[in-house]
Amino acid sequence: MKLNKIMIAAVLAFGASSMVAQAANQGSGTITFTGEIIDAPCSIAPGNIDQTIPMGQISNLSLKDGRASELKQPVSILLEDCTSATQKTVKTTFTGQPGGAAGTDNKMIGLGSGSTAKGASIVMTDDENGNAVIELGKATAGQGIKAGQEKAELKFTAFLKGNGGALDTIVPGAFSSVVNFALNYQ
C-alpha cells in the first residue's frame, strides 16, 4: 500500500511536469542577422540595399515610336552614419542588361528574359545632375556629401521608354528588370 501511494505520487508529479513543459512552447522561430562591413565613409540604409520599384501599368500607346512614359518613379539610395571629416563626392555606377531595340543601348536597361512584355526598356536619370540619363557601366557625375553630414540621399528617377518601334512592336505583358549599383567615394 505504501508502494502504491509512492507510485501514484510519482505518476502525478511526472504528469504535471509534462503539462508545464508543453504549455511553455507556444511558438518559436529563428532570427537571422545578415549584413556586410564595408570600407566607406557612409553606410547604406538596410531598406536601400535591395529594392523593388513598382513601375505601374503603362499603356503601350504611350511608348509608341520611342516615346517615354509619363509615369516616373523615384529611386533613392539612403546613406547613413556618414563620418567623413572632409567633403566627399559619391559616384554611382549602375550595371545591368543593356536595352533598346538591339539590346545594346547602355543608356537603357533591358527588360529581363522572363518578361512577357517586349519593345520597351527602362531609363534612369540622375536627379542631382540635371536629370542626366544614366549610362550602364559608367559612373554618374557624383553627388556631394558635406563634411559632418550624417545622412545623404542619392536621388534618381526611372521610367519606361519604347524602343523606337511602331505600336505592333510593343507587346503588352508583365516585365521585370534588375540593375546593380556600386558606390565610389572620392
Please identify what each model-predicted range represents.
Residues 2-6, 21-186:
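Mature extracellular/passenger domains of Gram-negative fimbrial/pilin and adhesin proteins
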Residues 9-16:
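Bacterial N-terminal signal peptides
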